[in-house]
Amino acid sequence: MSVRPCKFEVQGFCSRGRNCKYSHKYWEWPLKTLMLRQNYMLNRIYRFLDTNTDAMSDVSGFDAPQRTAEYALGTIGVLKSYLEKTNNITKSIACGSLITVLQNLDVGLVIQARDSNTEDTNYLRSCNTILSYIDKIHKKRQIIHILKRLPVGVLCNLIQSVISIEEKINSSMKTE
């Protein structure tokens, strides 16, 4: 075992375990190295406490300024703007607002809307696709990644079907 401090341990955490040949004993380290480790640790804490970044923006690119567009236009407004190519709505913003719409949809109402119109096969297919996305919604990072990888045409068709199904559900709720 060397007396030299492990550079990975100085920067945070050494994942080599017993295979590491360098010193992990802090009391043997020189003061300069201890100060350097303290600086790394404080920077890491500061990075995690920074309010400008959050987990959702790290994964999907769907950060705070984009969520304000959703707040101003509404989730359906963002989706319609993406379809019409207005208001400078990007694919990641549309995927994020699509997820919020899917979270707000009730599975039972979507199944009821699907069963009410059994003649149209395209409508049945889109309802089943929406139900499968609703089932996967508990894995938010994964579903954002899946939606962002969809081709633009497929994503636009999915958005149109979600909007039409949501409007049908809302109109049936208002009549009852």
Curated annotation (Swiss-Prot):
A single GO cellular-component term on record: host cell nucleus
Posttranslational mods: Phosphorylated by host in infected cells. Only dephosphorylated M2-1 is competent for viral mRNA binding. Cyclic turnover of phosphorylation-dephosphorylation of M2-1 is required for efficient viral transcription.
Gene name in the database record: M2-1
Entry function: Acts as a tetrameric transcription processivity factor that binds in a competitive manner to RNA and the phosphoprotein (P) to prevent premature termination during transcription. Transcription anti-terminator that enhances readthrough of intergenic junctions during viral transcription. Preferentially binds to poly(A)-rich sequences. Plays a role in the association of the matrix protein with the nucleocapsid, which initiates assembly and budding.
Name the record gives this protein: Protein M2-1
Disulphide-bridged cysteine pairs: none
Zn finger limits (C3H1-type): 1-27
Gene3D superfamilies to which the protein is assigned, alphabetical: Pneumovirus matrix protein 2 (M2), zinc-binding domain
Feature type site, description Involved in RNA-binding: 7-8, 91, 149
UniProt keyword list: Host cytoplasm, Host nucleus, Metal-binding, Phosphoprotein, RNA-binding, Transcription, Transcription antitermination, Transcription regulation, Viral transcription, Virion, Zinc, Zinc-finger
Cellular localization per UniProt: Virion; Host cytoplasm; Host nucleus
Single GO BP term: viral transcription
One of the Pfam families matching this protein, by short name: Pneumovirus_M2
Segments for region (Globular core): 75-169
InterPro entries, per the entry: Pneumovirus_M2-1, Znf_CCCH, Znf_CCCH_sf
Principal location: virion
Source organism of the structure: Murine pneumonia virus (strain 15) (MPV)
Any GO MF annotation of the entry: zinc ion binding
Domain of life: Viruses
Region listing for Oligomerization, in residue ranges: 31-48
